[in-house]
Amino acid sequence: MIGLVLVTHGGLAHEFQLALEHVVGPQNQLSTISIGPDDDMEKRRVDILNAVSKVNSGKGVILLTDMFGGTPSNLAISVMEAGTIEVVAGVNLPMLIKLASVRGDDDMELALKEAQESGRKYINVASQVLSGQ
């Protein structure tokens, strides 16, 4: 199973986990890291590395961050290893739900593709969708 680590500003990572588990049930191999404005960033980087080790069963780990270019994303990118530890910025609930359903069977490349597609698919302006635009 592909491991997941949510790395976000404030408590958003934990709230995403709660929302995901509300929809699809408890998740194994999932960890959260919250980055605060006064945190020691090297300590948080070590926390990310420890979380990656904890959730990694050999199929890889996806680090999901809230915003590309933000501190959580930059810290996640600093531990990235292409093909083994990947970073997806701009996490949303549809993306997490998709990953929960595919990470047990898909390889890393396919899971990343499906997560990105699902995340994009569910970003909509409701009035445009409802009017058929």
Task: Label each PLM-derived region with a short phrase.
Residues 2-133:
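N-terminal loops that bind phosphate or other acidic moieties
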